A protein has these predicted regions:
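Non-cofactor substrate-recognition interfaces
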Residues: 1-11, 16, 89-99, 106-414
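Gly/Pro-rich turn-and-neighbor structural signature
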Residues: 11, 18-66, 71, 77-83, ...
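Conserved beta-strand residues within beta-sheet cores
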Residues: 52, 73-77, 103, 184, ...
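Glycine-rich loop/turn
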Residues: 70-100
Length: 414
């Protein structure tokens, strides 16, 4: 170590599994607990099915964790329910009207319970054809993104005589709306395998909806996205959950990264909430091939099979490959999911401003490290997910009564 220029105390080393070190951590955790900065939360977190544990924001931002991957994407068609509230959207239309929503994770579509629009974004109603089936259809999407799906040169093409598969799909823009005016409109579930409890399948507004890509309409699956969960709660949208054999409410995907098998669900829940025939076709399938040791990258993915089902049912407008940046687990090198988990957190956001101020007092070498990577991390700070589902490491010194009516945080073995 001397030749390496590495300073280390070999006589009294810093070892994380040493009881003195663990007790020091217990003391610090107890102090945080007294100050109300240590809490248990049920939130959407980065989760590694391959490692079987949640990951912290810091772990996810290590070099190399985000990488470009090519996935199957789908622009899905959500049929609007025609009722008194939506009647104005059907003016001059004989058939059905749809919302178009794009996703890079088609496996989350069965868990959809809402669609989000930008309150100030302008949307257009377009009359055209389904390029896969050739059937006439009328759709809503953001005005700024209309050219990505309906090139201007096709606007003057004749509307009669179009055949499925034709590259140039004729269209007409028939109306313009503001996002906030679409809020509350109901639509039919895209894949009605499992019935959620509560007021689902309606349009809500979201402050994070943009017109940078997609259609300007965001598919919301509250169990698999932090932003989805936040805007859904704000609008009273329920998540789509299943009930397992132990009576616990779970997302449709289990901890290993696959759709729950029917035999692992509560029989009464299956009887009252599940279309067993439709869901059974995909039950037990892994959402990513990387989680299944029997599959390779060359095997068909769940995303592809779901997209083909939607295409066959006339519920897909565009299916294509798309390269995007996706997080991977630094331990297993496999993709992570955003997943609802019980975890213990340190409320770092409560001292965010002070952390940023103190960071500016540090004489970083080079300076760009402090203002760049570390500074940006502090600016986007979230509460620290502290707990891990593993058998090594420092045990959390928190004890609770069976009814969780009383909690104690032990700060010392003494």
């Amino acid at each position: 170590t001397r030749r390496m220029g590495y300073w280390i105390d070999m006589k009294d080393p810093y070892i994380t599994y040493d009881n003195k070190y663990i007790e020091t951590l217990w003391h610090l955790l107890a102090e945080l607990y007294k100050k109300g900065l240590l809490y248990k939360g049920y939130t959407i977190q980065p989760y590694s099915p391959a490692a079987g544990t949640g990951l912290s924001n810091h772990e996810l931002n290590q070099p190399g964790c985000y990488r470009d991957v090519k996935d199957t994407t789908c622009t899905a068609l959500f049929r609007i329910v025609r009722d008194q509230q939506s009647e104005r959207l059907f003016k001059g239309v004989d058939g059905d009207v749809y919302f178009m929503a794009w996703t890079t994770t088609p496996w989350t579509l069965p868990s959809n319970t809402a669609l989000a629009v930008g309150p100030a974004i302008r949307y257009v109603r377009v009359r055209s054809f389904n390029p896969y089936t050739g059937a006439p259809l009328t759709v809503f999407l953001a005005k700024d993104l209309c050219p990505a799906y309906f090139p201007k040169k096709n606007e003057d093409l004749p509307m009669d005589g179009y055949e499925a598969g034709g590259k140039n799909v004729p269209f007409r823009v028939e109306g313009e709306y503001v996002g906030k005016d679409l809020a509350g409109i109901r639509y039919e579930p895209l894949l009605p395998w499992i019935a959620p409890d509560g007021d689902a399948f309606r349009v809500i507004t979201g402050d994070y909806v943009t017109t940078e890509d997609g259609t300007g309409i965001v598919h919301i699956a509250p169990t698999f996205g932090a932003d989805d969960d936040r805007v859904a709660k704000q609008s009273g949208i329920p998540p789509l959950v299943v009930v397992d054999r132990a009576g616990k409410r779970q997302p449709m995907v289990d901890r290993t990264g696959k759709f729950f098998r029917l035999e692992d669900l509560d029989p009464e829940f299956v009887r009252t909430h599940v279309d067993a025939a439709a869901y059974g076709e995909f039950a037990g399938r892994f959402v990513k091939n990387a989680y299944d040791p029997t599959l390779s990258e060359a095997d068909p993915t769940l995303d592809v099979d779901l997209c083909m089902k939607l295409k066959f049912e006339g519920k897909a407008f565009r299916i294509e490959k798309h390269t995007h940046n996706y997080p991977h687990c630094w331990r297993t090198d496999k993709p992570v999911l955003y997943y609802p988990l019980d975890s213990w957190f340190i409320r770092t956001t409560a001292v965010k401003d002070r952390l940023i101020a103190l960071n500016r007092t540090i004489d970083w070498k080079p300076e760009s490290t402090g203002s760049g990577r570390f500074g940006k991390w502090l600016e986007n700070l979230v509460d620290w997910n502290l707990s891990r589902s593993r058998y090594w490491g420092t045990p959390l010194p928190i004890w609770a009564t069976e009814d969780h009516g009383e909690l104690k945080c032990i700060g010392s073995v003494a």
